[in-house]
Amino acid sequence: MDQKMINDLKEQVFQTNLLLPKYGLVIHTWGNVSMIAPNRQFFVIKPSGVSYDKMRAQDMVVVDLDNNVLDTNGLKPSSDTPTHALMYKHCPDIKAIVHTHSTFATSFAQADKPIPCLGTTHADNFFGPIPCTRALSDSEINGAYEHNTGLVILEHLKNNQVDVNACAAILVKEHGSFVWSNKNGKDAVDRALTLEQVAQMALYTQMINPHMKEANPALQQKHYNRKHGKDAYYGQDTKQED
């Protein structure tokens, strides 16, 4: 392995993990961010149970897609590592994953409810509702729990033909959210922050009007496509004249 590449990736993952408490997405030692190497042979993830204010870049743990620890500073990787590994193995577009127990998104997960698309804020960022997986069975919980968490995520994505680039988030029933990016860790955290915001908006909207239906499908399609479609026109061109 290229040690410079590993060190650079550790620094990126470290800095990105620090955004979770900064943005109010986690408390204590909850949550984690990982990023996969360009060759997709290994990924770097936050260590298990280490507080954010004591964590260092060199504490990030390097793991392969079969959960073998390749490089560590004497610390165990996040307990959610098998979930991340399975998603990287089966979703080649995913380059970074964020897992949190943020308040509003997790409330929907605990209620076994998808987050409906009720307006343009949601549609600008996620295509369609944010789905919620089925519950894990007792045998899945008592077996390889974190691996099985990954399996129920993949099961839902496959069975419902979810485009992981268009809807880059999922709720795991009774657990929390997993959010990902086809770009980098910072983008994945931004999406996790957006997920929390649209979950809060959805809850408040349903409190005001319990009978509120999802936003007009044409409006959803328009707002998603203008930012992410092949003819997207939101924002500035990459190259601009001086």
Curated annotation (Swiss-Prot):
Residue numbers binding Zn(2+): D80, H99, H101, H175
Cofactor comment text: Binds 1 zinc ion per subunit.
Keyword Isomerase appears in the UniProt entry: yes
Protein name: Probable L-ribulose-5-phosphate 4-epimerase UlaF
Known catalytic reactions: L-ribulose 5-phosphate = D-xylulose 5-phosphate
Pfam families (alphabetical): Aldolase_II (PF00596)
Protein's UniProt keywords contain Cell cycle: no
Binding site for substrate: G31, N32, S48, G49, S78, S79
Function: Catalyzes the isomerization of L-ribulose 5-phosphate to D-xylulose 5-phosphate. Is involved in the anaerobic L-ascorbate utilization.
Cofactor requirement: Zn(2+)
Homology family: Belongs to the aldolase class II family. AraD/FucA subfamily.
Cited InterPro entries: Aldolase_class_II_sugar_metab (IPR050197), Aldolase_II/adducin_N (IPR001303), Aldolase_II/adducin_N_sf (IPR036409)
Catalytic class of the enzyme: isomerase
Species this chain originates from: Mycoplasma pneumoniae (strain ATCC 29342 / M129 / Subtype 1) (Mycoplasmoides pneumoniae)
GO molecular function terms noted in the UniProt entry: aldehyde-lyase activity; L-ribulose-phosphate 4-epimerase activity; zinc ion binding
This protein's pathway: Cofactor degradation; L-ascorbate degradation; D-xylulose 5-phosphate from L-ascorbate: step 4/4
Keywords: Carbohydrate metabolism, Isomerase, Metal-binding, Zinc
Listed EC numbers: 5.1.3.4
Record's GO cellular component terms: cytosol
Catalytic-site annotation from UniProt: D124 (proton donor/acceptor), Y234 (proton donor/acceptor)
One BP term from GO: pentose catabolic process
